[in-house]
Amino acid sequence: MFRVSKKIKKCKKMLKSWSKDHFGSVKRQIAKTKELLWKAEEDAAKGGSYGPVSQIRRELNVLLDKESRMWKQRARTQWVAKGDKNTSYFHGVATQRKRRNFIKGIKDEEGVWQSAKGTISGIFMEYYTRLFTQSNPHELDRVLEGVQQVVIADMNAELVKPYTMEEVDIAIKQMAPLKAPGPDGMPPLFYQSFWEKIGPDVSEAVLSCLNSGTLLKSINHTFITLIPKVNNPETVMEFRPISLCNVIYKIISKAIANRLKPFLNSIVSEAQSAFTADRLIADNILIAFESLHYMKTQILGREGFMALKLDMSKAYNRVE
């Protein structure tokens, strides 16, 4: 695992240098090539050769394609605009996202507006530190006594058996190619494109983690980005934290998810309609509506009913 992590860091450094040479100045290269094309066309119109015009046009098309792909990756959109050139669309998407995600200020716990950069970061740090820190609960054994055992011996045997190279290959192929990268700076597309070359080393590292239960600390490093839930967010709770993980970490978690997937319908209660295949979160909305309708229209008998609505904020962030 350490050897692969070191290779990724070295590759990232080399790719940054390569990107600067080939993409960093692409706008200037396009402007310069357009100027050369204009001069070549002018010379050809005066009786010169048309050969340079064709050559420069090909070079310009390559540069324009680079620019389009660069902005498409930055936009990270799944929708492909129709037409020959999508650069302006992708540039607009990327710029709009950057502008929308910029945090100009936030209200603190007292409701006072804070706009200083250090104060804003401190407010978010304090909130999420409190959210993700355990509260030292007691008597967990008594709680677990009331949880019915649903994983039978055959299921457990399948879940704990050693992971294989095939499971790692399936996991990397299932990942969206241009998802935002984590601290490693690599999108899944890099691994997918060069899997034939880097696959054996990466698979060995992933399997060492899955089958030993140990993970290198640097692989677990994660960027947290805050996405606004509303158009003009004013409080910390109006932002949704998104974790940008290293690709190796994503492969590990994807392989585990694939292993669990066939058993989820048997493990997860039928009352839970989200996060499992062939179930819709809208089903529970219909059940709630029908239940309330029955309670409202029920007129026979003396037995009454009561509905209790619980709003558990951040219910999936911590289990204790």
What function would you assign to each model-found segment?
Residues M1-S115, T129, A157-K161, Q174:
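Arg/Lys-enriched, amphipathic patches
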Residues D84, M175, P183, P228-V230, ...:
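Residues immediately flanking
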Residues V26, R259-Q272, K296-L300, F305:
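Active-site palm subdomain of RNA-directed nucleic acid polymerases
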